[in-house]
UniProtKB/Swiss-Prot annotation:
The lineage of its organism: Eukaryota, Metazoa, Chordata, Craniata, Vertebrata. It catalyses: S-ubiquitinyl-[E2 ubiquitin-conjugating enzyme]-L-cysteine + [acceptor protein]-L-lysine = [E2 ubiquitin-conjugating enzyme]-L-cysteine + N(6)-ubiquitinyl-[acceptor protein]-L-lysine. It is an enzyme of class 2 (transferase). Residues 478-537 have a biased composition (Polar residues). Keywords: Cytoplasm, Lipoprotein, Metal-binding, Myristate, Transferase, Ubl conjugation pathway, Zinc, Zinc-finger. PANTHER family: E3 UBIQUITIN LIGASE RNF157 (PTHR22996:SF1), MAHOGUNIN (PTHR22996). Residues 339-361, 433-584, 650-672 are annotated as: Disordered. This is E3 ubiquitin ligase Rnf157.
């Protein structure tokens, strides 16, 4: 193919090619490719001379059977890459056949054998005025850099429809119908020897001479179902710019799954819609692996992977090149509500430091390719905050935060209010969770309700007289400052999944993006029955017993024996906890919940501070100084990840964010490229 510099001053070569001699792969003789290729203004030797760098070799046959005129339009010397602006985009996944509302019957045809006609519909985006025409059973011709399609019959084409610029436009032409049953079976599919395309959607830019010949082509085939109906399948997409035909290949990993029509997406599918690198799980992925076209790596991990392995981490196929694709946008003002972006915050700071070396124009910032193509990444529907619902149950999920990037105000409680609030909420949480835990266990009989109520009142009255002296109302000012951070019981390596609307970093470690993503990943997930059932203990209030001593709630204190209530003898097998007054169901009956009786070692339980409640879940903690699993009760209101070392026997060591892998240098083992190839309306590339 020669060097680029040798073509700049060369004339157009006049080649007399007979009609029976065309470019096809595999060629009848000789080689299809040269021994090197040029990309990003640099020359690279081809380690696989007969290997197509961007897909299967058979895809080359869609590029046309004749060579294009050269020399190509060379980019300016200071810009080694010439960006191609794609003005039209047909969303090939939206191409479909729609049955007509009324079946068309021909003259002399029996009533029971009416033909079924279809309309062709699809969705497209355009940045200019466009004229769209549909052809059937057409061949392709290139003349003076302009693509034209000729059907075998003039009736096998639709009228030309003109559209203005706009996104998400629907093509629907009710006056034009098609009946694939009239064609032979071999005409429904594409045959390379015949060079006839069953369906061609030709969208041409209709805006003067500046974009003359600029068009987008969607090739498709028809398939017949066993029931006699037909459907259309997209085959390939092509873009013609400046007289050169480009084959469009799909990049795997940039689709936006949240925009699909199926709203009931599994959690595994949602977690796959993240923008993070699949190796480090922290940086934004921006590097494409060729020829498999998996966008799954960040630039740092891609450089490291070149020295460690030569296989794609997704499909395990060997790769021959790495292509970095970056999109940039103007920096938003400090007062803009969307100026804080959760996915690209760390990438933005890095790009500002190295803007001179990475050729980032001043006033622009690098954004995620997924966000540039699909819009702002939004997580699942907003999760309600952690509060007690109207029916007395505690919502088993963490609060969600908006895109403004700041925490909601936290109400500071006095020691007395904190104690009463913790007791009330803890009992309600235990009630809701014990329902989920004991779904498969035996249900209390109705005749035991009255006896269990009186027994629980007896236990509360006995515990009123005994209080722990350490758990007084003394609260240091530091303990009242609530900080949201990652919970120690969560594996941070697994909390990388969903794209978030905002991230919140701990004040102690502002750069720990993985911790913030762990918290927000927890916020977007709900406590299911299986998750609760896996816990070996139940959630109890911090006012329950510890070594036979307890702190009663103010509401429970009002139910003392001094009110004249009877105190029956306590049975040995009574294992119930009393509820405060007012906890009744819809019929007015008192609700009594049985504590969890799963086989747990008595000396192996420990409690964890979770929003003022104590948790007997026996989860292992990543704390080096753990000597036993029992800890003292803490009356402080703590959020996940914040442990008061002064009142716990557990060592207070916060989990730190996993360090980022060092940035590897470029080497000669494999070819690496850094190219800005994304052109978006209103963005700078």
């Amino acid at each position: 193919m020669g060097a680029l510099t040798s073509r700049q001053h060369a004339g157009v070569e006049e080649v007399d090619i007979p009609s029976n001699s065309v470019y096809r792969y595999p060629p009848k003789s000789g080689s299809y490719f040269a021994s090197h290729f040029i990309m990003g203004g640099e020359k690279f030797d081809s380690t696989h001379p007969e290997g197509y760098l961007f897909g299967e070799n058979s895809d080359l046959n869609f590029l046309g059977n004749r060579p294009v005129a050269f020399p190509y339009a060379a980019p300016p010397p200071q810009e080694p890459v010439k960006t191609l602006r794609s003005l039209i985009n047909i969303r090939k996944d939206t191409l479909r056949l729609v049955k007509c509302a009324e079946e068309v019957k021909s003259h002399g045809e029996e009533a029971g054998k009416a033909k079924v006609h279809y309309n062709v519909e699809f969705t497209f985006d355009t940045d200019a005025r466009v004229a769209i025409t549909i052809y059937y059973q057409a061949t392709e011709e290139f003349q003076n850099g302009i693509a034209s399609y000729i059907p075998k019959d003039n009736s096998l084409q639709s009228e030309t429809v003109h559209y203005k610029r706009g996104v998400f436009q629907q093509f629907c032409l009710p006056s034009h119908t098609v009946d694939p049953s009239e064609w032979a079976e071999e005409e429904l599919g594409f045959d390379l020897d015949r060079e006839v395309y069953p369906l061609v959607v030709h969208a041409v830019v209709d805006e003067g001479d500046e974009y003359f010949g600029h068009c987008h082509v969607l090739l498709g085939t028809f398939e017949k179902h066993p029931d006699g109906t037909f459907c259309v399948k997209p085959l390939k997409q092509k873009q013609v710019v400046d007289g050169v035909s480009y084959l469009l290949q799909e990049i795997y990993g940039i689709e936006n799954k949240y925009n699909t029509q199926d709203s009931k997406v599994a959690e595994d599918d949602v977690s796959d819609n993240s923008a993070e690198c699949v190796v480090c799980l922290s940086d934004v992925r921006d590097t494409l692996i060729l020829p498999c076209r998996h966008l799954c790596l960040c630039n740092t991990c891609a450089d490291t992977l070149r020295y460690q392995a030569n296989n794609c981490p997704i499909c395990r196929l060997p790769f021959r090149a790495l292509l970095q694709i970056r999109a940039m946008r103007k920096k938003l003002g400090p007062l803009s509500p969307s100026s804080f972006n959760p996915i690209i915050s760390s990438q933005t700071s890095d790009s500002e430091e190295h803007s001179s070396s990475e050729n980032i124009p001043p006033g622009y910032e690098v954004v995620s390719l997924l966000e540039a193509l699909n819009g702002p990444l939004t997580s699942s529907p907003a999760v309600p905050p952690l509060h007690v619902l109207g029916d007395g149950h505690l919502s088993g999920m963490l609060p969600s935060y908006g895109s403004d990037g700041y925490l909601p105000p936290v109400r500071t409680l006095s020691p007395l209010d904190r104690l009463s609030d913790c007791n009330n909420q803890g009992l309600k949480l235990k009630k809701s969770l014990s329902k989920s835990i004991s779904q498969n266990s035996s249900v209390l009989h109705e005749e035991e309700d009255e006896r269990s109520c009186s027994e629980s009142d007896t236990q509360l009255s006995q515990r009123l007289s005994v209080q722990h002296p350490e758990e007084g109302p003394d609260v240091t000012p530091e303990s009242e400052n609530l900080t949201l951070s990652s919970s120690g019981a969560v594996d941070q390596s697994s909390c990388t999944g969903t794209p978030l609307s905002s991230t919140i970093s701990s004040p102690e470690d502002p750069a720990s993006s993985s911790l913030a993503q762990s918290v927000m990943s927890m916020a977007s997930s709900q406590i299911s029955t299986d998750t609760v059932s896996s816990m070996s203990g139940s959630y109890i209030a911090p006012g329950t017993e510890e070594e036979g001593e307890a702190l009663p709630s103010p509401r429970a204190a009002s139910r003392a024996p001094s009110e004249g209530e009877e105190t029956p003898a306590e049975s040995p097998d009574s294992n119930f906890a009393g509820l405060p007054a007012g906890e009744q169901d819809a019929e007015g009956n008192d609700i009594i919940e049985e504590e969890d009786r799963s086989p747990v070692r008595e000396d192996g339980q420990r409690t964890c501070a979770f929003l003022g409640m104590e948790c007997d879940n026996n989860n292992d903690f990543d704390v080096a100084s753990v000597k036993a699993l029992d800890n003292k009760l803490c009356s402080e209101v703590c959020l996940p990840g914040e442990w008061q070392c002064a009142e716990h026997e557990l060592g207070g060591r916060r989990p730190s964010a996993r360090p980022r892998s060092p940035r590897g240098g470029l080497g000669k083992e494999a070819s690496a490229f850094r190219i800005e190839t994304v052109a978006l309306p209103g963005t700078y590339v």
